[in-house]
Amino acid sequence: METAQAALYVVIVLVALALAFDFMNGFHDAANSIATVVSTGVLKPGQAVLFAAFFNFVALFVFHLSVATTVGKNIVQPGIVDTHVVFGALTGAISWNVITWWWGIPSSSSHALIGGIVGAVIAKAGIAALLAAGILKTVLFIFVSPTLGFLLGGLMMVAVAWVCRRQRPMKVDKWFRRLQLVSAGAYSLGHGGNDAQKTIGIIWMLLIATGYTAAADKSPPGWVIVACYTAISLGTLMGGWRIVKTMGQRITKLKPVGGFCAETGGALTLFLATALGIPVSTTHTITGAIVGVGSTRSMASVNWGVAGTIVWAWIFTIPASAVIAAIGYWISLLLY
């Protein structure tokens, strides 16, 4: 009885840790959702985070749990995951998020979590314990999502510039200040839909491993879904202002029309990835879209030094979080 009770306590602590990661994901990635709409002056920071948090939560009613299924069932071989693996994965992801948040670097919470899972699983059972299809799909979209965001953002900017070529700049600005509310809402919807499901996936993985949910179940318990969407929304509400300036102005100067095109390109990319069940980086996606918009003016209008720093952070995210996760896994073996 005592052993079963102790095991339950471990599960409760790990669920709380996963929700803390989800909260931090919202906090860390809030800048992605609101940077352009704040930097263009369409909304004040306080208004923007309320706006983004609302649409993060509404995503619960819009998207199927395809991403949660990928994370929960399609990355690791059945029977490998235990509480130590989940502890290591969350330790790696949270630690990397804190490091990059502190330095104001728009890293990817999503890839930190994937790196955490990979590192902890390899520490326990070796690389053969990973499911190649799920890992390759995720790794492929490390490159596809920012590229698609870049192309869609840039193409939309070119199309809008052509359509509005005979309109007065002040009139165009007025139109797109309103339209940017639509694009920011769509992007926040995509952010909530893809990112909250990653935490749903790891909690689902934990509940299957500990016998609280059957592996054959089509979806996790309802409380897991509601808790994860609530946590990411609250995190977004708290905001991550350190990163907003980097995303919204230091990469390239944005006007409302550019903000609209970047957010719409990013949102379309996220909708596609979520429909396909692919956990992507919302950070990579919106950054690619912002660079795409900036490059339509001239390549010199993009601050490639800042963009380069962000790319290096992306490159290091999965290996760094994997190493920390492996250490976390071994530490957990000493703790319980």
Protein language model annotation of sequence segments:
Residues 1-336:
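Multi-pass alpha-helical transmembrane bundle typical of ion/small-solute transporters
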